[in-house]
Amino acid sequence: VQGIRTLTYGGVSVQVVIHMPSASVKDALVLYHPTVWFDDRTLPAAENTLDNFKRLLQRDDMLLVSVAYPQQNREIGEGLREAEAALLWVKNEASRALGLSIGRVFIAGHSQGAYIVTRLNTLHQTDGVIANAPGPLDFEYRCLLEERGNAPGSQECGLMVARHGPASANPAPYRRISLLSFTAGFKADALFVQGVGDSAIQMRSWPLFKQSVQACTDCQRPVFLEVAGGHDALFMSFEAREAFNQFIDQRRSR
């Protein structure tokens, strides 16, 4: 059974796409889509993200909740309010609202969705986090490239320039929301997947991110998997799919 639902938690409303398997549900996987910017694209992105992760899973006994968190006219990370509300609804209200008994709760995301789950892992306890090609890792660098004409312009950097001025003149707000600023305090084990053929911007900062997380002294266990392929490596690589399922299965059986 699959359907769209608007949920509210703590006064924050967000649309989600829910997949309820025919098998008896034991655990939940909350999903976060990549960058789409425009509000009218977030729901299709959430549906697409749900389908992609549903294909990855080797068994159909998890409640899947894909979150259509907003991005339009918001700085990177500002959609965290809605992303967080959906996670807390699944943790605290979904069992009663859906008539299920949910045990463990996992979160997963791709690209900016992986950024979101990594930040959520600093805020809330879950049973495991999967992040594929998380980013932006270094938003200052990304927007500096655009400022210098070395990368095509984006709405995300344009919004920051309008609010804070260019990165060259005021780098602090850009650094503050970069994922490189969120590499400590992880509350759950995390699997980070990265295709080594991803963009030059991503691969420039990936080793710095990996090194910083591995140096963390107050994190649960982070696992890094680098595989052949590009930005969508988790969905294309057999090795990544096996690691994804193993990561979840090991933590479901504890």
Give the label of every model feature segment.
Residues 21-29, 186:
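Proline/glycine-enriched tight loop/beta-turn segments at coil->beta junctions
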Residues 88-111:
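Gly/Ser-rich "nucleophile elbow"/oxyanion-hole loop immediately N-terminal to the catalytic nucleophile
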Residues 109-119:
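Glycine-rich nucleophile elbow surrounding the catalytic serine of serine-hydrolase chemistry
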Residues 118-167:
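Hydrolase active-site cap/lid region
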Residues 186, 192-194:
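Short beta-strand/loop motif that positions the catalytic acidic residue
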